[in-house]
């Protein structure tokens, strides 16, 4: 993304130089406008909540931290991104959230996190767009939690991005059968159900309520409590 955007800025600057004289302030404003179209990958703390935002650099995606546990994200023709707010480290906490989630194509709204030793990427999916993310994995069972049934899946990612760099690791999924964009997620119910199926988490790293987009467009505005 950085190299693409930098190239785009340089091209626009060159075109401007050939077309009409441009002052340094005008050129700087033009470059800033172009660069603001996408948010670079970053992690940190915002208003008492941990946030994580990652993008592969494809398309345009703007992630913005708001007050408290809120954030917004807008994306257009992206490759892949995932971002949101929550906690670091994660735990078997009860999570409350609300807002709007409007994907056009493939996107997920989920409690999302990582553990280490073993390295596990996990999702508790509350809503999704045109593609059920569990359909590419192995169905392991179901769990009833917070008023609905979730299907449980596992999958393996090979040589994929992770919190430890490029790695091969397991994914654990709980996918809610009835989609929603607000409510309570009792993570202990999912973690216990996974453990009963031999799906063991490691030591918790971060845990967020995330929006993810894959080769799609859309918008979301989410608040974590």
UniProtKB/Swiss-Prot annotation:
GO terms for cellular component: extracellular region. The keyword Cell membrane does not apply. It catalyses: Endohydrolysis of (1->4)-beta-D-xylosidic linkages in xylans. Residues 1-19 form the signal peptide. Its EC number is 3.2.1.8. Residues 37-225 form the GH11 domain. Its main location: secreted. This is Endo-1,4-beta-xylanase A. The gene is xlnA.
């Amino acid at each position: 993304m950085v190299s693409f955007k930098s190239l785009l800025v340089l091209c626009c600057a060159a075109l401007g130089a050939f077309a009409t004289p441009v002052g340094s302030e005008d050129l700087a404003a033009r470059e800033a406008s172009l660069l603001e179209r996408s948010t670079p990958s970053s992690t940190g703390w915002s208003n008492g909540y941990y946030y994580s935002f990652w993008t592969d650099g494809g398309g345009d995606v703007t992630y913005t931290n708001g007050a408290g546990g809120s954030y917004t994200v807008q994306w257009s023709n992206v490759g892949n991104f995932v971002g949101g707010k929550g906690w670091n480290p994660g735990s078997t906490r009860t999570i409350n959230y609300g807002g709007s989630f409007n994907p056009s194509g493939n996107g997920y709204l989920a409690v999302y996190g990582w553990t280490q030793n073993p390295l596990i990427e996990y999702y508790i999916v509350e809503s999704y767009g045109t593609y059920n993310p569990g359909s590419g994995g192995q169905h392991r069972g179901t769990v009833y939690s917070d008023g609905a049934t979730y299907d449980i899946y596992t999958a393996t990612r090979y040589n994929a991005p992770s919190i430890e760099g490029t790695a091969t690791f397991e994914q654990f999924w709980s996918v809610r059968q009835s989609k929603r964009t607000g409510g309570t997620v009792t993570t202990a119910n999912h973690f216990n159900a996974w453990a009963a199926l031999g799906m063991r988490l490691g030591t918790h790293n971060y845990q967020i309520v995330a929006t993810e987009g894959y080769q799609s467009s859309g918008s979301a505005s989410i608040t974590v409590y």
